[in-house]
Design a protein with these regions (language model features):
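Helical scaffold of the NTase/Pol beta-like nucleotidyltransferase catalytic core
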Residues: 1-2, 7-61
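Acidic, metal-coordinating catalytic segment for phosphate/diphosphate chemistry
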Residues: 94-185
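Distinct, well-ordered alpha-helical segments
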Residues: 269-279, 305-306, 328-332, 360-370
Length: 384
């Protein structure tokens, strides 16, 4: 209220800039209410579907954003078949109900909408599985969609169309991709960007390596925080040396797993990396990331990142915009300049797979790949 009324700037210790920053953060927080990270939503949906299977609902199909596994979901929709609306669904509290829909809250936190199937459940869920940005009428004649199919894969087959996985149904330009061209879990050969107890991870180097070996991986890249990240117990130079000695020792216990020595080096305010050259040279791989002084305009952020990318010891640009989905907007960057710098310096870009980051944004990946840039899909793991 005080920001909107332009009053906070007059309070001691505040000014125009801080008032604007606080207002933007408050507006971002308010606009995020009721929205979910898919990574947090998924286990709740599994529990809900167990409850639905125990109710009077005979068939149900998740559709919309949640079915597409969108990184942010602001509505959860099920198409259902039922003789009548169930009196009880375990964990579900009814808010509103009419002949066609039922809305309520599951486990006191998740707003769910159930839509009663009017004509054919699979057909209706199929149509709603596409983003509003997709012109589905250019793909098939809606009036000729088949009835009585068990699932959307069967509908694609009946239309004599290649199957489009739900995750791609947000962008018509991606529909040419076939299932065999997409990354599957069994394609994962190793993991990059793994923190340990040396910084802010939960498990030791050896515990992380044991887990990687049990998963059948060929390599693991141990990547703790650098010295400027004091809040995350970042490694001073002596600790770097200590960790490298330990990795060499642990490596002797793993004949089928290669352990790489890495660091998530802070990109400092002037764009330099967080160690002198002789220390940077000791790593097999350097990921450079910004963790501090995030309030930047596009010119300052881009200049800072490009300088880091041009450092000869930099291998991967980590979580490029610094965003935390539903919590913090990322700083703006000039993607063209960043991509050109990465291509010129053979620096890969991280797709940070932490559900709260997913940074860089998936919408920019095709453009980066077109410039010959490799994408490193990393867990940013802090535990096994």
């Amino acid at each position: 209220y005080y920001c909107i009324e332009n009053r906070l700037k007059d309070a001691k210790g505040f000014g125009e800039k801080s008032q604007k920053d606080i207002l933007e953060k408050a507006q971002h927080y308010l606009s995020s209410k009721g929205k979910w990270l898919y990574g947090r939503l998924e286990p709740i949906l599994k529990d809900l579907e167990v409850a639905l299977n125990s109710s009077e609902i005979t068939r149900f199909q998740l559709t919309g954003q949640a079915y597409r596994k969108s990184q942010i979901v602001d509505e959860v929709i099920y198409i259902v078949d039922a003789e009548e609306w169930p009196v009880y669904i375990e964990g579900f509290e009814l808010n509103d109900q009419d002949d066609d829909s039922m809305i309520g809250v599951y486990k006191e936190e998740l707003l769910v909408t159930f839509l009663l199937s009017v004509e054919d459940l699979s057909k209706e869920a199929f149509i709603q599985s596409f983003s509003e940005d997709v012109a589905i009428e250019t793909l098939f004649d809606i009036s000729k969609l088949p009835f009585g199919k068990d699932n959307d894969r069967a509908i694609f087959e009946a239309l004599n169309l290649p199957y489009i996985i739900p995750e791609l149904r947000w962008n018509q330009d991606l529909f040419h991709l076939k299932g065999e061209e997409l990354i599957k879990e069994e394609d994962i050969r190793g993991v990059v960007h793994c923190h340990t107890t040396y910084s802010d991870g939960i498990h030791t180097v050896k515990e992380m390596c044991n887990y990687a070996q049990d998963k059948g991986y060929e390599y693991i890249v141990i990547t703790d925080h650098s010295q400027s990240a004091f809040y995350a117990s970042g490694l001073i130079i002596e600790r770097v040396v200590q960790q490298h000695i330990e990795i060499d020792k642990v490596q002797k216990d793993f004949t089928n797993l290669k352990i790489f020595k890495s660091i998530e080096s802070d990109i400092l305010n002037d764009g330099s990396l967080d160690y002198p050259e002789d220390v940077l040279k000791s790593f097999d791989l350097v990921i450079g990331s910004i963790h501090s002084v995030l309030n930047m305009d596009i010119e300052r952020a881009t200049t800072r990142l490009v300088k880091a990318i041009e450092n000869p010891h930099m291998h991967i640009l980590g979580h490029m915009t610094g965003r935390l989905l539903l919590s913090r907007k990322g700083y703006p960057v000039d993607y063209d300049k960043i991509f050109d710098a990465c291509a010129a310096n053979n620096v890969s870009i991280e797709l940070n797979a932490n559900p709260q980051r997913l940074d860089m944004d998936h919408t920019m990946i095709a453009k980066a790949v077109a410039k010959g840039i490799k994408i490193s899909i990393n867990p940013d793991a802090h535990s096994m």
